[in-house]
């Protein structure tokens, strides 16, 4: 996990105050053979609607990151994933929740992508062309840039 907590929209009040619980989330970083990766938009009616992120979802009580990732990707985008490769963990302080994002790389899956929650999807390379990018997604783009020797901006910042 990174040393610091990423604070998203720091000018906005935090729901639940300083002592709120951490919400664990399993996040799938699906990477195709050519190196492009999958981003999905947040569904209508959810916090940060329309922002782009890596797919995934909350862990249920007693569920492992891998089990949650398998379940969420089947439920949300209709695929069955192969091996799960735990990659990085990032703690993000959003106004609505304190979230621990457990990023896992996935290189193999079966099935066709079906966005079951009304979201859009896009296969991307650096710099990503979709916007706006969810704050918790930005560190992943930086990690990809470091791995790939990419030195330009990873995304466009919108206000």
Language model segments and positions:
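NUDIX/MutT-family hydrolases
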Residues: 105, 114-148
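Conserved Nudix-box catalytic region and its N-terminal flanking loop in Nudix hydrolases
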Residues: 36-75
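Actinobacteria-biased recognition of intrinsically disordered, low-complexity terminal regions
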Residues: 1-11, 156-159
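Short, charged, intrinsically disordered terminal tails
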Residues: 149-156
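Conserved N-terminal beta-strand and adjoining loop/helix that marks the start
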Residues: 6-37, 58, 89
């Amino acid at each position: 996990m990174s040393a610091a907590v990423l604070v998203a929209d720091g000018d906005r009040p935090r729901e639940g105050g300083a002592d709120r619980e951490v919400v664990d989330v399993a996040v799938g970083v699906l990477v195709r053979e050519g190196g492009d990766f999958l981003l999905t938009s947040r569904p209508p009616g959810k916090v940060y609607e329309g922002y782009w992120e890596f797919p995934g979802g909350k862990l249920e009580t007693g569920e492992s990151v891998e089990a949650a990732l398998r379940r969420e990707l089947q439920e949300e985008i209709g695929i069955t994933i192969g091996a799960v490769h735990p990659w990085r963990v990032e703690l993000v302080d959003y106004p609505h929740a304190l979230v621990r994002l457990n990023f896992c790389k996935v290189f193999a899956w079966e099935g066709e992508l079906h966005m079951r929650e009304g979201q859009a999807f896009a296969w991307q390379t650096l710099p990503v062309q979709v916007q706006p990018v969810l704050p918790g997604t930005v560190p992943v783009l930086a990690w990809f840039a470091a791995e790939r020797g990419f030195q330009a901006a990873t995304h466009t910042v919108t206000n």
